[in-house]
Amino acid sequence: MNHSEARGSGGHKGYRGRSQASEQWVPVAADDKSLEDSSGNRVRGSQGKGRSRTSWSPRNSYGRGNDEHSPVQAYVNKSNVGFVEKGVQQDRKSLEDGIGSTKQPDDGAAAGDNKAVLQSKSTNVSGGSFVSSECEDKDGAKMYCDLVNRVNDVTLSCQESVSSTVVQKVELSSVEDQKSAPKADGAGNSSNESSTRHFDIFLEKKGIVLKPNLLVLSREKKKAAKGYSGTVIRPGMVLLKNYLSINDQVMIVNKCRRLGLGEGGFYQPGYRDEAKLHLKMMCLGKNWDPETSRYGETRPFDGSTAPRIPAEFNQFVEKAVKESQSLAASNSKQTKGGDEIPFMLPDICIVNFYSSTGRLGLHQDKDESENSIRKGLPVVSFSIGDSAEFLYGDQRDEDKAETLTLESGDVLLFGGRSRKVFHGVRSIRKDTAPKALLQETSLRPGRLNLTFRQY
């Protein structure tokens, strides 16, 4: 139970009346002003109307001698006491810190306040800053307690006991521990603790979110109005610049977020040697296991099933493949070379989220079926959010790799003769995501990348 103490100096000038009928002091208020208690109620000074009798004890005279016995003792209710300290002896550190511990008459009564009920006999409230109270519990044991009542500076309130507060803290701590405890998979495997917690690609909204600059929004709208442009990067590799509109990107982000928080959602992938990929991953259609480089229906470490690919995603892919085929055919006529891109129907989508420090080394997408690889069925990649420095080449050598900037809304396709191209992400360019996209979603800083392929 929290408690503060302040001592008065000398006798209070308001106590000047003395009763001749007994050895008890009757407090007389210095003026007619009412005293306002902590709850906003008005408490009248004792001008003969309340006639509350107040006892005093030499033990509480605090060494002032017999010159003036100020009536500084009062009986108070427990419910009216803001800060109570039982016992005359008190730890000096508790006094300095303003925290006192209430000792119960019985050790077994420490768990509850119902065994130590303070019974009020009389109460005296004066305009002074210090009141010393004498309390009596139900067992008849005397207790001396100090009550701080600074009306202008301190608001007195009923406080719960320290024991009940500690119990509440323990209960809350237990609930938080249960929430943060990692869930074991069906086989009892609790490894990859951080991996079992679904990653949220949205930031938690806090406070007021400022709207983006109108000039920036206007520039982005003009860019979107121009439509997309297609470029053949190399035989079998096509870049569709600004292919996905802001509305399309918002829809994709929202669906990925919803899927990512459910079964089979985003997690931290790793390898057998405990090395971790610098990204978060979620598989749709089929699960890809980085430890075995194989596809399956479920994830080995938690047994979750890969969610289905949304129909809207497949529609974007089919249109992008057809557009790429048209561009590749036109380029093939100009170069008089066989630059064909086969058509494909995606049944796998790997969704990766790169943070601002995310990256991915050069690699080949060659874990699909032999038939898919042999036919050169294309891989289609969507980029949303911050821009990425994309690497590609015929060798696993970053120094010899070509560089391409993939911005939000871009679609990259590589198939045919470029199906086995080495590719990766060197870095993410911070704060390059479209402001309009961030205004419509709470996408956290980074890049959301979806790669579609047919097994």
From Swiss-Prot:
- Ranges of residues in domain Fe2OG dioxygenase: 345-455
A single GO cellular-component term from the record reads: nucleus
Alphabetically ordered keywords of this record: Cytoplasm, Dioxygenase, DNA damage, DNA repair, Iron, Metal-binding, Nucleus, Oxidoreductase
Which cofactor does the UniProt annotation name? Fe(2+)
Look up keyword tRNA processing and say if it applies.
no
Q: In which tissues is it expressed?
A: Expressed at low levels in roots and seedlings, but barely in cauline leaves, rosette leaves, stems, siliques and flowers.
Instruction: Spell out the Pfam families in the cross-references.
Output: 2OG-FeII_Oxy_2
Region annotated Disordered sits at 1-114, 173-194
Please list the residues that bind 2-oxoglutarate: N352, F353, Y354, R447, L448, N449, L450, T451, F452, R453
- Cite the cofactor comment: Binds 1 Fe(2+) ion per subunit.
Location in or out of the cell: Nucleus; Cytoplasm
List ligand-binding residues for Fe cation: H363, D365, H423
For this UniProt entry, the molecular function terms from Gene Ontology, in alphabetical order, are: DNA N6-methyladenine demethylase activity; metal ion binding
EC numbers:
1.14.11.51
The UniProt entry's GO biological process terms, in alphabetical order, are: DNA repair
Q: Which reaction equation describes what this protein catalyses?
A: an N(6)-methyl-2'-deoxyadenosine in DNA + 2-oxoglutarate + O2 = a 2'-deoxyadenosine in DNA + formaldehyde + succinate + CO2
Q: Which family does it belong to?
A: Belongs to the alkB family.
- What is this protein's function? Dioxygenase that catalyzes DNA N(6)-methyladenine (6 mA) demethylation with a low efficiency.
Name the chain's protein.
Answer: DNA N(6)-methyladenine demethylase ALKBH1C
Name the gene that codes for it: ALKBH1C
